[in-house]
Amino acid sequence: MKTLLLALMAMIALGTSARTSSDELTAKADNNGYIVFEGDIAPDFTVTLTDGKRVTLSSLRGKVVMLQFTASWCGVCRKEMPFIESEIWKKHKDNPEFMLIGIDRDEPIEQVQKFRKITGVTYPLGLDPGANIYAKYALRNSGITRNVLIGRDGKIIMRTRLYNTKEFKKLVERIDEELGEKTKNNH
């Protein structure tokens, strides 16, 4: 009986702890569901790309990194991805100081490969089973598309949510600035 009572108390304590942690994340989140902010060190993770290669974020220190959280069912993602491809990836893909990874939220590799074909993007796409990488950056139940720009020092320097042309232009300009390149409008 004593063992049963102790086990029950332990389960209640764990449940309360998990709920408190979830409540704390919700309280910390901004109105876009982000739980990370400009100036924060970007949470580390390892992602498996569709080609089987594994990439750990911390191994990219010293580079400017853009994370694009996406999914095949996201209409806004489908709208934004061709612009990411043409205005960011094609411009910087050969720059060794830059990395872009699309992180597909909780879909199997076959779906992600089909999604790549439909959108026509060539930048790396990674798999996020269970949305566990996503949950390091935003509330698990919050929506996508969202982009996180990370500086060479590993700190977040910009976050976007949904596809807004003015905000996207600022993202492009910020990447160019971080890489020491001029935007097309500044030539």
Where do the language-model regions lie?
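Conserved redox-active cysteine motifs that mediate thiol-disulfide chemistry
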Residues: 61, 69-83
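N-terminal targeting signals for export/organelle localization
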Residues: 1-44, 186-187
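Short loop/turn microsegments at loop-to-beta-strand junctions
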Residues: 42-43, 65, 144-146
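Thiol/disulfide oxidoreductase modules built on the thioredoxin-like
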Residues: 117-122, 128-176
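Structural microenvironment flanking redox-active thiols in thiol-disulfide oxidoreductases
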Residues: 78-119, 130-136
